[in-house]
A protein has these predicted regions:
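Short amphipathic alpha-helix that is part of the acyltransferase structural core
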Residues: 1-49, 138, 145-182
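Acyl-donor-binding surface of acyltransferase catalytic domains
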Residues: 2-8, 76, 80-158, 286-289
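Conserved donor-binding loop and adjoining core beta-sheet/short helix segment
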Residues: 30, 34-106, 207-228
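Residue-level recognition of the GNAT/N-acetyltransferase active site
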Residues: 95, 231, 235, 264
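Conserved acetyl-CoA-binding loop-helix of GNAT-fold acetyltransferases
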Residues: 99-111, 227-230, 236-249, 253, ...
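Conserved active-site tyrosine of GNAT-family acetyltransferases
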Residues: 130, 269-274, 278
């Protein structure tokens, strides 16, 4: 099948493509949605511009092409993730009152059919929504932003003395829930780009990375999302902002055109991005089917 853009575009409230995630508004076309259908016909291959290609050899989420609902007022795109006990998601692009009921029924049916333990509906809001919730999609435009190097105790990990580098393991263990234990394993294997670290009293207390730039769907250089965190006892000291600014400086001087981020609406990272002048592109949120 192929999507009709005159049906789909009016109900796409935020630039988000199933299995791909947020995309730059200039890249958002029916071709990206169609690409996900092509990927579903392969043996879980990645699209060349999929940000998750950095972390795995096979895609764990695919579009269930035969079960797509596509009509003028709504489009329902189901996906299946085989991670854990399995999750079916229905990406609901539509504003009709009955769309949620249709998405719920489809999610429940497909969860049973595929033996998935979870069934969810993914919904979207535009950037102007007064009740924005869930996850906000943020855009940093390096063509217009001014990103000077910050003055503070932040350097690439490999530029610190060996004794300081040795404290990253403890930091990663404390920040396991934020993904840093996984990242540290990737760092040890030499599989990732630079990781910027904040150090206090000879100890790593914050980090952001890896710093990597990849082409998007039309070849524009995009700074990839990073793991980002500061130890609880060092929050409120301005280290998060220092790390953030160092990352933005790195992206700009290394030739990235933009970065897309996802932040918890109303959370610390969301407030940081807002105060740093990023542009909100909309929201994604989910509910149990």
């Amino acid at each position: 099948m192929r999507f009709r853009w005159d049906w789909l575009r009016p109900v796409v409230l935020a630039p988000y493509v199933p299995t791909i995630g947020p995309v730059h508004p200039s890249v958002l076309t029916e071709d990206l949605f169609t690409d996900t259908l092509t990927a579903a016909s392969t043996d879980r291959w990645f699209l060349r511009y999929d940000k998750d290609i950095r972390w795995s050899e096979a895609k764990d989420e695919i579009v269930l092409v035969e079960d797509i609902v596509h009509r003028p007022t709504e489009t329902l795109i189901p996906t299946l993730s085989q991670r854990g006990a399995g999750t079916v998601k229905i990406h609901l692009y539509g504003i009709e009152p009955e769309s949620v009921a249709a998405a719920t029924e489809l999610a429940q049916t497909l969860a049973v059919e595929h033996g998935a333990a979870k069934a969810r509906i993914v919904r979207f809001l535009g950037p102007e929504a007064p009740d924005g919730r869930g996850t906000r999609i943020q855009l940093q435009n390096f063509r217009t932003a001014i990103c000077p190097a910050p003055d503070g105790p932040v350097r690439p990990f490999d530029q610190w003395p060996a004794g300081v580098r040795g404290t990253f393991a403890g930091f990663a263990e404390e920040m396991t829930s934020d993904g840093f234990a996984f990242l540290y394993g990737q760092m040890q294997a030499g599989k990732v780009g630079p990781v910027l670290t904040a150090v206090v009293s000879g100890r790593v207390v914050g980090a952001i990375g890896p710093m990597e730039i990849r082409p998007d769907a039309i070849g524009t250089p995009q700074l990839m999302p990073q793991y980002f965190g500061v130890l609880q006892e060092h929050r409120g000291e301005g280290l998060g902002r220092l790390l953030w600014r160092a990352a933005m400086h790195w992206g700009q001087v290394n030739g990235a055109d933009y970065q897309l981020l996802q932040t918890e609406a109303g959370g610390p990272s969301d407030r940081l991005c807002w105060s740093e002048g990023l542009t909100s592109l909309g929201f994604t949120y989910w509910q149990v089917a």
